[in-house]
Amino acid sequence: MALPCTLGLGMLLALPGALGSGGSAEDSVGSSSVTVVLLLLLLLLLATGLALAWRRLSRDSGGYYHPARLGAALWGRTRRLLWASPPGRWLQARAELGSTDNDLERQEDEQDTDYDHVADGGLQADPGEGEQQCGEASSPEQVPVRAEEARDSDTEGDLVLGSPGPASAGGSAEALLSDLHAFAGSAAWDDSARAAGGQGLHVTAL
């Protein structure tokens, strides 16, 4: 790193002597071209030395002096200074006003969209509501009919349930009579012994 700096300083020291040595116009033109070339070489050497020094410094510091990091830090500081300045505050106020205007416009658009959806839904729901109203209007007339149908069904059920009654009653009476016929017979009591003062036997013949 010291070698390019030394060469640059030597060229700068030799440049005034080279410029003052020419006496004629041709010598002055040639010396000016030589001066431009020397200045370009000096600039190239300085840029090379700066790049090498920066690379070594970044490697030794663990990337702290890396160009990307330094550029990001410089841009962040510049932006903070810009927003802190009066023009920056004015721009920030304009941006906030623009954002609020956009929010209001978005809310109005959403409200308009909701209103359109509600209107479309109401128009589509009108036929259904009309049919429902018609159904509700016809339902009072159908209530007596349904009541009569329910009454008829109850009557038929009573008839169906009540029809086996006499048959079952007749069947039970016949069964009772058959039992009585099975146990039918003649019964006689011998009261002669009791009339004589003795204890007679009660004989029952079936």
UniProtKB/Swiss-Prot annotation:
Keywords: Membrane, Phosphoprotein, Transmembrane, Transmembrane helix. Residues 98-173 are annotated as: Disordered. It comes from the Eukaryota. The modification Phosphoserine is found at residues 99, 153. It is a single-pass membrane protein. Phosphorylated on tyrosine residues. The chain crosses the membrane at residues 34-54. Pfam families: PTPRCAP. It is found in: Membrane. Its main location: membrane. One of its GO terms (cellular component) is plasma membrane. GO terms for biological process: defense response. Residues 161-173 have a biased composition (Low complexity). Interacts with CD45/PTPRC. This is Protein tyrosine phosphatase receptor type C-associated protein.
